Amino acid sequence: MKLALKDFQDAAVAVLVRRLRQAAGEAKDGDLQSVALSAPTGSGKTVMAAAAIEALLQGDDRHAPDPEATFLWITDQPDLNEQTRRKMLQASSALKSSNVVVIDSSFDQETFSPGSLYFLNTQKLGKEKQLVTPGDSRTFTFWETVTNTVNARPGSFYVFIDEAHRGMAESARNQKEATTIIQKFIKGSDGEISKVPLIAGISATPERFNTLIEGAGRITRPVDVSPEEVRSSGLLKETVTFFHPTENQPSDITMLRAAAQSWQDFSGRWKDYCREEDELPVHPILVVQVRDASGKQISKTNIAEAIRAIEEEAGPLDNDAFAHALQEGARLEVGDRELRYLAPADIQGDPAVRVVFFKAALNTGWDCPRAEVMMSFRPAKDGTLIAQLVGRMVRTPLARRVDSDERLNTVSLYLPHYDEAGLKKVVDTLTSKDPNVLPPADIEKGEDMVPFVVPLAVTMRLPLWRSCRPTQCRGRERRAR
């Protein structure tokens, strides 16, 4: 591996590889098998899966390489596949662009190639889609490719189902369609595909994958990672602070200005820390969640006014410092400025971006440790989506905690349309012990704050970063530093 794994990840990978090899031996003899890796949000499930794939391909001190090993990775959205593909290429020395393939509508092979990892999103397999429709221009349908591969090497064909990132922002109809397609791999489908002998599930909780394979007659081999292991590893921020109005309701732009001040504070602190510790620079990102469209307007939020407010606090920014994830592939005219589009998978690796406008596109599978401050213009009814976004934002930029500046172990969220009751819904979701959102956290409340802190921060007696009204924020942050 190109990346050093945390101790808990190393241990989980060892168990995962052992379970996969055991399942492969049984699958070769015709038994239906499943292996379930369950680990909370932020634990590095993709990196652990990449390490397991590498071990199967390259072998180890006790096991020879499996030159026949073939992997199919399934999600229900193309941007998730792209982000996962990039992570795996960055993490693994065994996976290269030559043996990592994204399946598109032109794919046409008798079997999958040994030693390769294929990425597929279920949208390619809907009714009348080219991949599954026989015709003069196609030699093999996708279902025939799967069946032929199973018949050729049943103990060396691993189908990974990424359940961890599904369902956050999808309609019920889309979720049902994706589940139906995935069930074909698990239970087979008359006239299309036989049951795939070896299924590996990647999920935040065992229940999610177990529900998917219920009634399939498979032997399931679990691999579980506890929330406590993730919290103590330094992979996640320790404190999330919510800023919300308590009296004399400030305007949206006032709250945005406060968020921009906080973002600038993070930027300065990271610059100082990276210089002192000789680290590569960390450039924090301010993410701004705007409201839905109104008539011909792309959003009810005045994005041009928001940009002016941010620049009045932070100073002039290059055009490339701003981006949006509102319309796929389209540049957006905002006043006298043109905002470029960035797919969620591209945000973390873009060296120039500093501010990103979005609606809900960042919720599903998005991973951006640089996102340190969020401002949401959306109403309180979107509390669950806000909570899910928090779960995507709490990754630490350096994959470890910062000991010399506690502020860098925090995330700040500004929610001007959330009163105490609306904010309580967000906090309740975050503390619901649902690993799909975030490892469990504790709540502490002050006079006009609602921070929540993971138990590790409490036991270490780390300071809480108090939420405040926008007019108080600038002074408090200076004193805190």
Please identify what each model-predicted range represents.
Residues 3-31, 121:
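N-terminal pre-P-loop "Q-motif" helix
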Residues 27-52:
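Walker A/P-loop
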Residues 43, 75, 100-101, 110-116, ...:
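Conserved C-terminal RecA-like helicase domain
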Residues 47-51, 64-93, 121-124:
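Conserved Walker A/P-loop ATP-binding site and its immediately adjacent core
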Residues 102-108, 113-160, 168-188, 338-346, ...:
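Conserved RecA-like ASCE ATPase "motif II neighborhood" in helicase/translocase motors
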Residues 395-481:
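Long, hydrophobic alpha-helical segments
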